[in-house]
């Protein structure tokens, strides 16, 4: 199944890709933002940007199993998971990223990131988290034994909200627009 959230909706759609059909939905508070699946815990995690929380969805009954606070990360947008270390990374629009234990929901730490973050991406090979903020900064974090630490920021074109990581090459791909033109650029990780 594929779990799909729609901005400002009040449910997460569960889609059967073989039938290309919504088979059920999970009721949630308004304004979902990012959804990720953890294959180790077999849970779906959904940020709720109108509240500082991450919803935990059990895909068996397709119901909310828990609600975890993301405070101090307010307006959580970007969300990523490291299944190997059982860590969930939730990035708030207010410039805070909180690390949660993906089994218990316990907060493991917080780190400052650029304000206005939208999407984040995790590279499992080098254990880095990349946080795209539209004002021209990409925050780079390193997962550590304790939680995460900041490695600094990389300048990006204004409006860079979208990114993806190639876990084979460790390149970070960003997308942005200038006027009516759209661009994609590759950033090489060091």
State what each model feature region is.
Residues 1-190:
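Predominantly soluble domains enriched in secretory-pathway, periplasmic, or organellar proteins
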């Amino acid at each position: 199944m594929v779990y799909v959230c729609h901005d400002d909706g009040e449910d997460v759609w569960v889609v059967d890709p073989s039938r290309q059909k919504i088979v059920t939905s999970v009721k949630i508070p308004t304004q979902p933002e990012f959804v990720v699946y953890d294959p180790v815990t077999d849970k779906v995690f959904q940020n709720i940007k109108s509240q500082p929380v991450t919803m935990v969805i059990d895909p068996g009954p397709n119901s909310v199993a828990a609600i975890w606070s993301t405070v101090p990360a307010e307006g959580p947008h970007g969300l990523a998971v490291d299944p190997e270390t059982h860590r969930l990374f939730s990035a708030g629009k207010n410039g805070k990223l909180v690390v949660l234990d993906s089994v218990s929901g316990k907060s493991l730490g917080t780190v400052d990131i650029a304000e206005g973050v939208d999407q984040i991406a995790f590279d499992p090979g080098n254990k880095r988290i990349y946080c795209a903020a539209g004002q021209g900064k990409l925050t780079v974090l390193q997962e550590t034994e304790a939680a995460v630490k900041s490695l600094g920021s990389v300048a990006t074109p204004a409006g860079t909200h979208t990114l993806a990581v190639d876990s084979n090459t460790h390149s970070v791909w960003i997308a942005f627009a200038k006027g009516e033109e759209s661009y994609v650029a590759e950033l090489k990780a060091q």
